[in-house]
Structures are given as C-alpha cells and as structure tokens.
A protein has these predicted regions:
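Conserved protein-kinase N-lobe ATP-binding Lys motif
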Residues: 7-8
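Long, low-complexity, intrinsically disordered segments
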Residues: 175-188
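Short, conserved glycine- and acidic-residue-centered signature motifs
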Residues: 50, 102-107
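A conserved beta-strand->loop->alpha-helix hinge within the catalytic CA
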Residues: 15
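The catalytic core of metal-dependent phosphodiesterases that act on cyclic dinucleotides
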Residues: 12, 21-97, 111-113, 117-151
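C-terminal helical cap(s) of enzyme catalytic domains, especially alpha/beta-barrels
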Residues: 136, 152-175
Length: 188
C-alpha cells in the first residue's frame, strides 16, 4: 500500500474526486493499493465536509487514514464521525513507551479504543525492538519507522525489497538489541 497525504488545499479542491477517478482509470491502478491520508489537524476542522469527502474517496475503493493522531488536535469526535480505516498514532506517544508506564498505558488505551471503532492502528516512529515488543503486547496492528529503515535512496530501497536480505537484517538487529538488554549496555 502506498500512502498519499492530502494537504488542506487539495482536500477542498472541487475536482479532487474526479481527478482520483480519472487517474485510477487512466493508469489502471487498483485503488486498494493506495491509502489516502489526512492529518489529524485537518480532520478535526470541518468534520462534516471532511466526512463527505472521505466517503467519496472510499466509494472509489481507496482506504483512508488519519495521520499524526495525538499531536495536539486530538478529536475523538473526528474519529467517531469520519469513516477512516486506519489511525496512525503519532511518534510522540512511542518515543518513551518503554520507559514511561503512563505512555504505555495511554498507548494501550488508544489502541483498544480505536479497535473498538473497527479501525486498524499503526504506530509511527518505532525505532527499536523494545518498543516493538511493548506495542505487540498491546495488540498493535502495524508499525512504521526507523526500526525497519531510515530514509533510503531509491537503489537502497530496491535492495531492501529483497525479502531475505530484509529479514536477515532485522533478525540480526533484534539479536543485537536482546544482547544489549541482557548485558545492560550498548554493543556495537
């Protein structure tokens, strides 16, 4: 799935839905392979209009997500009234989840709440195996972040697509992190 983040200007463009419909037809793109993202701040504004646009986007077959959830514009009303498929939990909740029980409790509660709304939950900004372990414990659906890779050049990304190399690299990284945890220090 490729995510496309819509700007404020784009979401209010009266030709947006027609553009999406024509583009998927012209290039024979499966809309199920594309997720349309709106930031939380945008979704929390004109919820009735945003809800209308999201319904139109979904009617074309796209999935939709609310991005950066929890960074100051949190609106339970927005996730209640707008039919998003995915909620992306902001990195600020993940940064200290392994050392702060309050953060862990909050993340657990948000995951439970969002699952109750039949939405898929992704944690953004996951950087290490310890965070992954804690998030798995709370039934998180998926992660994104430096845990997998830092931003890459095209050639590096293409090399990552070789599944075996990717899995080998993650297994090696996880084993190193586990040894550090057991020893209580850093290992290079």
């Amino acid at each position: 799935v490729v995510s496309v983040n819509l700007s404020r200007r784009t979401i209010y463009d009266p030709g947006l839905i027609k553009f999406f419909a024509e583009t998927i037809q012209k290039y024979d793109v499966d809309p199920k392979s594309i997720e349309i993202e709106l930031t939380e701040s945008l979704a929390a504004q004109d919820t009735s209009f945003i809800s209308f646009v999201i319904r139109k986007i979904k009617s074309l077959g796209f999935s939709t997500s609310i991005d950066d959830f929890g960074i100051g514009y949190s609106s339970l009303s927005a996730i209640k009234n707008i039919d998003f498929d995915v909620l992306k939990l902001d990195k600020s909740f993940i940064d200290d989840v392994e050392v702060d029980k309050t953060s862990e409790s909050l993340v657990s509660s948000i995951i439970s709440l969002v699952h109750g709304l039949k939405m898929f939950v992704i944690a953004e900004g996951v950087e290490n195996p310890s965070q992954v372990s804690i998030l798995k414990k709370h039934d998180l659906d998926a992660i994104q972040g430096y845990y997998f890779a830092k931003p890459l050049e095209v050639s590096e990304f293409e090399a990552l697509l070789d599944h075996n190399k990717f899995e080998e690299a993650k297994t090696k990284e996880t084993k190193k992190a586990n040894r550090r945890t057991k020893k209580g220090g850093d290992e290079k």
